[in-house]
Amino acid sequence: MKRGVCILWMVMAWLQMVCAGEWQWAVTLKGFVSDETKKEPEAFLWVPAHCERLSAVMWSQQNMTEEMLFDMPSFRDSLAEMGVGLIWIAPGIDQQWDVRKGTQKVFDQMVNDLAEVSGYTELREVPLIPFGHSAMATFPWNFAAWNPERTLAVVSFHGDAPRTNLCGYGRENLEWGRTRNIDGIPSLMIEGEYEWWEARVNPALAFRMMYPESCISFLCDTGRGHFDVSEQTARYISRFIRKALEQRLPADGGKTLKKVNLAAGWLVQRWSPDERTRRATPAPVARYKGDVHDAFWYFDREMAELTEQRYKEHKLKKMQYLGICQQGKRVDYNPKLHAGVLLKFLPEEDGLTFHLNACFTDSLRQEMTDEHAAGKIRLERICGPVEQVDDTTFTVRFYRMGMYNPRRTSDIWLLASHPGDKHYK
């Protein structure tokens, strides 16, 4: 994974978790015991205020940036406009979505239970949008393959292609068999620029050729890495969901989702790290003049141009590199660490509050530098038992995840990022 520019990840190994967005209802899952807690997981439901009936539900399992996206106020505002709710399961129940283990039965019972406790009875049959990041980015594809009649759309974030041989969880993928597919289900794969790996993208292109009725869209999350969700990318995801609702919900209010009309879509050439390469012009499927084997499908002109504009925004700009300072000293960067920087927990006298600052560094991350874009570096929470007090102050806060998950309550993950300018990424 390539690290650089305006992204840095930090893990603080020590204690436990964060206060976040409102979730109005919760149920305990039946028929499954988590290896992480030795207890049944919990499922949390958020429904937009004043929503009388849900049009769809986006859902995920606990991992990392799922929380970051689902708690983002602007993203929730967009979902509220569409009548889309959220479900978050913690701990997760299956990275693969192997129905032979009873995973589907556990999920179906959970949805029924949430319908009962919330009063939103449509949850039993409402269209679903599986979302997953990294080690949880494979299951959305498999969930859709086993639930095509209920899957409105798929989003695999900083993760995997459908039927990939490089699963984020590091083991084998599930076999779909000869007849299972996700034809007509709009699906979005997102990969960050600073985690770019051709071997992750190529299976998505191959899948499009193997399944010509599939609707696979792709976004290179330019200027971003593996562990973050920018508001810009969140807006792209919400726009993708809006298009799926517009094109798939039946006009007569029926239950059967419509398949997307592939021929009415657009094609856009996939992103390449070689930004000097001349790109084919985005165009409707029938009029695209580029190599169709090297392009992805998009709903319409708006999504195609939104994608292409994102690539132009960061094209040929200079890199920025970030560092973290703790108690006035720059903390060493370790390229071998998945997180990049490992911090000590150095709280104030209350044992909870701690302070961090970010700085610009040279490309080796050894010295501070003045060669960078204007503006402040932003520090924010990814996941873990922490609440952000101000730009540089954080405090330990336990939240809905609880206090008794050794794996999840021992880490705090934070992100440092900078938006760049017309010269810098």
Map each language-model feature to its residues.
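Alpha/beta-hydrolase active-site loop
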Residues: 97-122
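Short substrate-entry loop that stabilizes the transition state in hydrolases
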Residues: 50-98, 163-164, 197-199
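Bacterial N-terminal signal peptides
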Residues: 7-16
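A domain-start/cap signature at the N-terminus of enzymes
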Residues: 18-57, 128-143, 147, 151, ...
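The feature captures the conserved acid-bearing segment of alpha/beta-hydrolase catalytic domains
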Residues: 153-238
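Structural recognition of the beta-strand scaffold that forms the well-ordered cores
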Residues: 57-61, 85-90, 127-132, 152-158, ...
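Alpha/beta-hydrolase-fold serine-hydrolase catalytic core, especially in secreted/extracellular enzymes
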Residues: 222-380
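Positively charged n-region of N-terminal signal peptides that target proteins for export
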Residues: 1-4
